[in-house]
From Swiss-Prot:
Keywords: Ribonucleoprotein, Ribosomal protein. Coiled coil: none annotated. HAMAP family: Ribosomal_bL32. Belongs to the bacterial ribosomal protein bL32 family. This is Large ribosomal subunit protein bL32. NCBIfam families: rpmF_bact. Pfam families: Ribosomal_L32p (PF01783). GO terms for cellular component: large ribosomal subunit.
Amino acid sequence: MAVQQNKKSRSARDMRRSHDALEANALSVEKSTGEVHLRHHVSPDGFYRGRKVIDKGSDE
């Protein structure tokens, strides 16, 4: 088991953790329908950048 030789200071500990913060997902609003969706993803209605790309019809 690894054991430290010298105690790490609060400053060194906090600087190491500076990259651990979580970020919120970037959301976009579809211009034609107003739906909120993830960036670079198709909206739940099947629209992407104002165009219908997926027909959400019946699955027969």
